[in-house]
Amino acid sequence: MNRVNTVEIGPITEAHIESFHKTLDVVARERRYLAFLEAPPLESTRAFILNNIAHGYPQFVATVAGEVSAAEVSAGEVLGRDVVGWCDVTPKSRPIYAHCGVLGMGLLPRFRGQGLGTRLITRTLHAARAFGLSRVELTVREDNRSAIALYEKVGFVTEGLQRNGALVDGEYENIIEMAILL
């Protein structure tokens, strides 16, 4: 079932924190996409989001109203108008990199492959440009072909390769460095 039409995309709010944390944890525990293998503690996540909100950093969430199945709930996913995906750009803190941001994003498995990632990243990059950033960077595991295709589709280019840049479950993985000029 295509659920993209029932999904809303909007800026993250304090009300999204717990749902965002649950979704982040589901994606992290897949051990295939993020730099961490489980979500940070809820209070760390809360501090990150509240800081993003306070500074006006681009952070958008995809939410859905009550269409997540019972099987997804038992797998740790969420119900209600809750977060099913996110995309954020956090500006770098050093003065010479103040024009740069770092992109992070994720989607619950059931919501992948339906164009939602494109909607999220497009909205977030537009907000990053409006925020004053002129460069956005990301890293992605080399075997994450669908994410790489998405990033290339919206204009990211490969700038480098970190050989054996990640070690997960005893297996090394290459990390691709990508960026887009806004």
Question: Predicted regions span which residues?
Answer:
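Short glycine/proline-centered loop/turn elements that form peptide/ligand docking sites
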Residues: G117, I121, N144-A147, N164-G170
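Terminal substrate-recognition subdomain of acyl/acetyltransferases
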Residues: N2-R3, E173-L182
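Conserved GNAT acetyl-CoA-binding A-motif
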Residues: I121, A128-T139
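Flexible nucleotide-binding loop
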Residues: Q114
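A short beta-loop-alpha structural element at the N-terminal edge
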Residues: V7-F20
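Conserved catalytic-core motifs of GNAT/GCN5-like acyltransferases
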Residues: R135-R141, E152, V157-E173
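Acetyl-CoA-dependent GNAT
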Residues: P11-E14, V26-A28, R32-R110, I121-R123, ...
